[in-house]
């Protein structure tokens, strides 16, 4: 993983995952960090159940602290001021390897992951990996 601060408020992350793909993401910190969580957005196309089609990452650790109005997450699973960039990255890398199909941000990717993991889902992931390799050094 490579991290570069681009403006003092956000990090550009290059994650080497998914069969040597290089996926870039921004981690943007609010003014009241660490009381509120940063936002993470992939800028490299990625096909994953917990990353929406705009690249926004949907993971409990990056959700606002407190009760989940939908009842899917426990308060202790959500953002706490003790979390660090390291704990965020560990959680995101774990999520990328083991998607949460119960709370998808990309419903189409979640459906393929459940029903055709080794077929269409794997083909789309492989396409994203190839594309990420082609643009890794841009």
What is each residue range found by the language model?
Residues 28-37, 92:
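Proline-anchored loop/turn motifs at beta-strand termini and strand-loop-strand connectors
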């Amino acid at each position: 993983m490579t991290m570069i601060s681009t403006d003092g408020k956000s990090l550009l992350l290059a994650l080497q995952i998914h069969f040597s793909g290089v996926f870039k993401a921004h981690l943007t910190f609010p003014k009241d960090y660490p009381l509120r969580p940063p936002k993470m957005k992939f800028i490299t196309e990625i096909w994953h159940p917990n990353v929406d089609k705009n690249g926004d990452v949907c993971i409990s650790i990056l959700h606002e602290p407190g009760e989940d109005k939908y009842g899917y997450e426990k308060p202790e699973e959500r953002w706490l001021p003790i979390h660090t960039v390291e704990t965020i990255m560990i959680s995101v890398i774990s999520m990328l390897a083991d998607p949460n199909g119960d709370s998808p941000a990309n419903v189409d990717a979640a459906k393929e992951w459940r029903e055709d993991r080794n077929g269409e889902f794997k083909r789309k992931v492989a396409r994203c990996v190839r594309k990420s390799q082609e643009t890794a050094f841009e």
